[in-house]
Amino acid sequence: MTRETAILAGGCFWCTEAVFQSLSGVDGVESGYIGGTVADPTYKQVCGGDTGHAEAIRITFDPNVISYDDLLDVYFATHDPTQLNRQGNDIGTQYRSAIFPQNDAQTVAAEAGIARAGADWPAPIVTTIEPASTWYPAEDYHQAYWDGEGQRNPYCMAVIPPKLAKLRKGFAERLRAD
């Protein structure tokens, strides 16, 4: 079975993870850190804004079921790519909108995805395309957060359901049947 990986940063990784784990063809979503200068960063370090890392998700997907372009379209529809270094009340470079292509084809697709999404937003897209770098999985308690603690977390309850509603409205045909 062919599997590919996509790494996307779009604000809080709990919120982004909840969206992508709902998609058919996505085998796994892991929260983590990428794009910084500190080896093995902790959540506390990344939240401090001094490591250069973004909170991101690493998506493992079946390209025969869902394409990288489809993932990018969902990504741009379910976060605000016009906000520089923030998503809502989450402010700092760790919450930046960034794509970390894993190969040249993904870089080309990311550029095209930004161009496609530009028509859907009233302000310029500030999403960056950053070089692939070392991926650091977040601590275990951050993984599949929405499925557990997230549904008791007031922040998540305010942010994630509207993202999931956008996903259901715009990408119903891409949702998991289970």
Predicted regions located by residue number:
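Flexible coil/turn and secondary-structure edge motifs
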Residues: 1-178
